[in-house]
Amino acid sequence: MKQINGGVCAAKGFTANGVHCGIRKNKTKRDLALIYSEVPAAAAAVYTTNLVKGAPLTVTKNNIANGVAQAMICNSGNANTCNANGIEIATEMCKLLGDALDIPADNVIVASTGVIGQPLNIEPIANGIPALVGGLGDNSLYACEGIMTTDVKVKEIAFEVEIGGKTCHIGGIAKGSGMIHPNMATMLVFVTTDCAISSEMLQAALSEDVKSSFNMISIDGDTSTNDMVSVMANGLAGNETITAAGADFDTFCEALHAVTSYLCRMIAADGEGASKLLECVVSGGKDEHNAKKVAKSVVCSSLFKAAMFGADANWGRVLCAIGYSGADVDVTKVGVAFASKAGEIKVCEGGAGVEFSEERAKEILLCDEIQILITLGDGDAKATAWGCDLTYDYVKINGDYRT
């Protein structure tokens, strides 16, 4: 497997575009995105667990109940959530796009992201669709820009992999800076592949993958109302269709995880106001469930995230987060170290502090990517979670989000 360019357009038969249609006030910001497959594709998705769900999720879930999709449309700037006519608007978006592409409206995945509780006017979307469709091409970047809200960085990736003797491609784009806390979904992620795989196996692969990828990110502890991860697989690579578990399915799952884990890191690093990516790596867990609980609890701790912003090696906040994680852990066996490109330093062993240089620790924690290495001493299970530091800018961004 090798990393390639192209994002969601790396796979055969997929094109994309993004335009400004007028939902967002800033005319330099794209606010409407499209991904299109030249043939119908197997489709799968996972959705937010928030009881308050955006209308687009309801429409998408109904549309791809048969496991087929051919296009994805997403607007940014308005979440189309808690609106009396939300379902009607999301359904109309599918119809307008279906008419423009000459495909069935129920072959469309629809998504929205932005402010909750404000009416979404269909007119700018209707006016923008002709340019959106007319500009379809190798424009993964434009589509990525079209789904961004408070994101600072574009998030896209693609890989090439051999499956069943054929060269397959898989790529994805994502948005998500705030409201990142699972369980699924925690952001918008759109993945495309030309691998031939049944919708049932595609759903199985995605549902399993999110447990160790997107469900292991936390930016601010809020679970979004709108977000989802969707995958379209159009089969144009020509491999024998994957319909059951086996070597080809395992290879596909590895490729899918390469995409999702890369996007996870990018999302965590681009947390609202973030200056540092935090990666908590837990080893020696009694089982994976306990290891995940520990890793997730640490990256969710506001006190610890604030300490990382200040480059303060306050390992006590790590143990505190482990203690309330709900994991079955023997604290007297816990070890903690901090690592970055500047080096590594142990700060805790056997559940107690060890002597270390505060100056050396600060050098390590001043880097923009920090690893928190935790050993539990209870077994062989491992887990990784991602987050970011908590900065002044997070409050500034969210204090005036609607303006």
Feature names for model-found ranges:
Residues 1-88, 92, 98-403:
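A structural signal for small-residue-enriched, beta-sheet-centric alpha/beta enzyme cores
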